Amino acid sequence: MDTNVQKRRENKKSLRVKVISLGNAEVGKSCIIKRYCEKRFVPKYLATIGIDYGVTKVQVRDREIKVNIFDMAGHPFFYEVRNEFYKDSQGVILVYDVGLRESFDALDSWLTEMKQEMGSQANMENIIFVVCANKVDLTKRRVVDESEGRLWAESRGFHYFETSAQSGEGINEMFQSFFSSITDMCENGGKRPTPEVSVGFTKEQADTIRRIRNSKDSWDMLGVKPGATREEVNKAYRKLAVLLHPDKCVAPGSEDAFKAVVNARTSLLKNIK
């Protein structure tokens, strides 16, 4: 075989990609990476100082993928180090601890920081994101359930996996799906392919479900001010009912959100003359 032809074939098969991990300190980013790359779990917490860098090789179909992994420190102190490593990423692993709600709520701020460093939303659109709901083995301390995490991820077009760095649950499946999607993107000219199947719900539905989950009281849940009239309560209820009725909305958590709205309306109307 001609040497040049052989080299071209080898170059076609070989692919080099850059992946970064994001999330608050102590959510298990480094442990997830070590579990996959080194097949081990490190029980003692060792804070990442700035950036940890590693390289691994994986096989995706007929291609060898050389993955450069940049494990970002989650502490705010290391922002000036992190901000140098966002650009030119093909994949992002977003991690939160299912037992720490603040780590889940912080996912939006991590995306904001990344967007700020990337320069524009367009640069974010051709990156594969995967969300890891980590430490699912610690069931008794869980405060963010699967439906809430899945809703947040899927409403943004991100992959979602339940993982445990300690037990290994979901780790291999997550990385296999992640690297396969990155490969598909690279083979599609660096553009994220349009998913064959849509998630089946809108961002408005997803945001509404999350708002209802986080509501302080029945007034807040329906989006009306305390002291609202019967007509205002019913109008707000009807709008939410149309948006979230389980027969029309397949978003994770929609059934519970709809029930909560029904109960909120009933509770408020009892006290309105």
Swiss-Prot record:
Residues in J domain copies: 217-273
Residues binding GTP: 23-30, 71-75, 134-137
Top-level taxon of the source organism: Eukaryota
Compartments where found: Nucleus
SMART domains on file: ARF, DnaJ, RAB, RAN, RAS, RHO
Gene Ontology MF terms: GTP binding; GTPase activity
Database matches in Pfam families: DnaJ, Ras
GO cellular component: nucleus
Nucleotide-binding as UniProt keyword: yes
Chief location: nucleus
Keywords: GTP-binding, Nucleotide-binding, Nucleus
InterPro entries, per database record: DnaJ_domain, J_dom_sf, P-loop_NTPase, Rab, Small_GTP-bd, Small_GTPase
Cited PANTHER family: RAS-RELATED PROTEIN RAB
Record function comment: GTPase possibly involved in regulation of the MEK/ERK pathway.
NCBIfam families (UniProt xref): small_GTP
Family the UniProt entry places it in: Belongs to the small GTPase superfamily. Rab family.
Listed name of the protein: DnaJ homolog subfamily C member 27
Gene that this polypeptide is encoded by: dnajc27
